[in-house]
Amino acid sequence: MHFLQRPQRQNNIHQLTNLTFHTPDKRYSLLFQWLYLTGMRSGEAIALSKDDVHITNNNASVVINGTMMYRERSIADMKKSDSTKTAAGMREIDLPKKAIAIYNELLELNPNGQFLFQTTKGTPFQLTAINTYLRSHKADMKIDKKLSSHIFRHTHISKLAELGTPLYAIQDRVGHENSDITEKIYLHVTKGVKEKLKEDIEKL
């Protein structure tokens, strides 16, 4: 796994933010924002039912209990699996206010149908279509790196690490059964933060 140094990483995050919030297609934009804010796997997100999101006066969360089954299936036959990619993937995570706003916007955008994220035809998103969309629009946003929908999940982990969120809490949030991936990202980012601190204390 290749890691970027902090200035490069910050620049990439800025580019991804532009891509996420300024994508011309509203439905893709909302999906990318959701992936960035939740750290969910793409297959988990596009499999969400509207009733998987729970909002009360004091709390908002989403239950992640499946992934989209799409291989060797027509769009009409795509459906949600009974479990996630791993046992640790079966989880419930808190939603920030921005994600709640996206949820409410999606309900207005997709008043019919089971799935939270839908195309203009009312069908579920296809993972291949999402990645194709990213590749076709990255040049417009001046992003010169290879892109897939997984980049939003990695960016979510990196940002939480920079903010000082404990490793175990990040692992629990993103549903990593094998913590190696999360730990590698976390250790790399926190190392960069420590190096920045060394530079800062020299300015005291």
PLM features per residue range, with description:
Residues L48-E105:
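Conserved tyrosine-mediated DNA breakage-rejoining catalytic core shared by Y-recombinases
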Residues H2-Q8, N65, P96, Q118-T119, ...:
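Residue-level detector of conserved, well-ordered beta-strand and adjacent loop positions
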Residues H14, L48-D51, T155, K184:
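Structural detector for helix-capping/boundary residues
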Residues M1-L48, N58, A88-M90:
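Basic, Lys/Arg- and aromatic-enriched nucleic-acid-binding interface segment
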Residues N18-Y28, T38, I93, L109-F115, ...:
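Short, basic (Lys/Arg/His-rich) helix/loop patches that form interaction surfaces
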Residues I46-A47, P124-L127, H188:
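Gram-positive cell-envelope targeting signals
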Residues N18, S74-D77, L163, K184-L204:
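DNA/chromatin major-groove-contacting recognition/catalytic segments
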